[in-house]
């Protein structure tokens, strides 16, 4: 079964100590390692088979040193929790810090928690918190538990938000439910003349054409062909007499 927690420290003993300490801190217990001091705790382990105890607890988490991580690659989206025991805060702020924190961020599962343990009252606490946010972690807070400051951050679960339908993906409502269908009208395009109740526009077109044809037939005609030149060239009975000259073929309306 794959382990859900990674502890990064110089030694397995240190990883064991901070793993238990952080579990106590997370559960809100006021005790530290079960009311047992570090010295008596590890001495009791030595007298009762500490190696087997460490091995059994190591089944709860993976352990790597920061040096091992830098010279290898962490699997992406693998751990629910990553706990880093920091003995050199220089590794976690500035360009070097952002690079290391991004590596841990990418190895967390969505909603996974990153925790870094630093000495209390560290002068670099604010810089580390800022670099954690730059790496993509959210909800970055710090808390002091006994002689350790735990700075925690969460990798956001952006995937769950993208699963929701965006407005552009919402199915459109059928338009037929909002707009009534236009009634079907009989077409007279195949008939010899327009229908009495024509709605396709044929009756209007035929009426317009008939008006143009009538005006052309009723227009006066010239017998001499010089009417357009003006009165000096028109005959006595010219219907255009008294009108100004016009261009040949130009339609002139008579009063």
Swiss-Prot record:
Requisite cofactors: [2Fe-2S] cluster; [4Fe-4S] cluster
Biological processes, Gene Ontology terms: iron-sulfur cluster assembly
Principal location: cytoplasm
Alphabetized HAMAP family for the sequence: Anamorsin
Species classification: Eukaryota, Sar, Alveolata, Apicomplexa, Aconoidasida
Protein name: Anamorsin homolog
Annotated region described as Fe-S binding site B, given as residue ranges: 224-238
Keyword hit for Plastid: no
Highest taxon listed in the record's lineage: Eukaryota
GO-annotated molecular function: 2 iron, 2 sulfur cluster binding; 4 iron, 4 sulfur cluster binding; electron transfer activity; metal ion binding
Domain comment, as recorded: The C-terminal domain binds 2 Fe-S clusters but is otherwise mostly in an intrinsically disordered conformation. The N-terminal domain has structural similarity with S-adenosyl-L-methionine-dependent methyltransferases, but does not bind S-adenosyl-L-methionine. It is required for correct assembly of the 2 Fe-S clusters.
């Amino acid at each position: 079964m794959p382990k859900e927690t990674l502890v990064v420290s110089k030694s397995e003993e240190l990883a064991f100590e901070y793993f238990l300490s952080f579990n106590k801190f997370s559960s809100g217990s006021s005790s530290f390692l079960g009311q047992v001091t570090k010295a008596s705790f590890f001495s009791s382990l030595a007298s009762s088979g500490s190696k087997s105890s460490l091995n059994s607890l190591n089944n709860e988490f993976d352990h790597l040193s920061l040096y091992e991580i830098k010279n290898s690659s962490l699997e992406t989206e693998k751990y629910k929790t990553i706990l880093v025991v920091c003995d050199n805060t220089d590794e976690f702020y500035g360009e070097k810090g952002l690079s290391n924190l991004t590596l841990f961020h990418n190895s967390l599962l969505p909603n996974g928690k990153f925790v870094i343990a630093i000495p209390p009252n560290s002068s670099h606490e604010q810089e580390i918190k800022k670099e954690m946010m730059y790496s993509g972690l959210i909800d970055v807070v710090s808390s002091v538990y006994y002689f350790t400051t735990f700075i925690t951050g969460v990798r956001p679960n952006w995937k769950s938000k993208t699963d929701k339908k965006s407005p552009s993906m919402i199915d459109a409502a059928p338009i037929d439910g909002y707009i009534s269908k236009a009634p079907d009208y009989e077409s007279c395009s195949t008939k010899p003349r327009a229908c009495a109740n024509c709605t396709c526009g044929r009756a209007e077109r035929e009426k317009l054409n008939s008006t143009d044809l009538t005006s052309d037939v009723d227009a006066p005609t010239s017998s001499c062909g010089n009417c357009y030149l003006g009165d000096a060239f028109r005959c006595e009975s010219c219907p255009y007499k008294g009108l100004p000259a016009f261009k040949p073929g130009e339609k002139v309306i008579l009063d």
